Amino acid sequence: VSRGLGDVYKRQATEIAKIAHEMPEYAHAVVLADDSGLEIDYLNKEPGIYSARYMGEDTSYDIKNQALLDRLDGVPDEKRTARFVCAIAAAMPDGCCEVVRGTMEGIIGHKIAGENGFGYDPIFFLPECGCTSSELSPEKKNELSHRGEGLKKIRKILEQR
């Protein structure tokens, strides 16, 4: 299932990059686009590709986060595994499109914690760090995050072109 969702992230990022690249002002530029989401294994990869629209686009992340915590109430840590997934597409001036995928593995914590993040960061717990993604410094989060991993991969590809 995760592989299929990963392919959807890649397809959506690629489509966005290609559409933007067709605009005259970007025709001779490298255009980057991304699609990302939170996959919770116990919830069959929800909210997944619908992460931004989960429970409705106008629903605050405070409410979304609490709803996910409520759904996982009583679920042991070993079954709370989750990951942030990011696909980054680079549409090139020659029409070629490169796509990479980055992930950050963790678990869904038991409470909302931290002030440095956004979205689902306050419930995404990193056991190796002993804190949520929202409790990391911005520098540490960039080093560990799914987007950071994806950007490192796409940068390497761009430097080789």
What function would you assign to each model-found segment?
Residues 1-9:
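Single conserved hydrophobic/aromatic residue that forms the stacking wall/gate
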Residues 79, 83-92, 102:
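A glycine-rich beta-turn/hairpin centered on an aromatic-Pro dipeptide
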Residues 95-122:
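Catalytic beta-strand/loop module used to bind and position nucleotide/cofactor moieties
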Residues 153-161:
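C-terminal alpha-helix
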Residues 10-25, 44-45:
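Phosphate-binding chemistry for phosphorylated carbohydrates and sugar-nucleotides
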Residues 27-80, 117, 122-152:
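Active-site-adjacent loop/tail segments of enzyme domains
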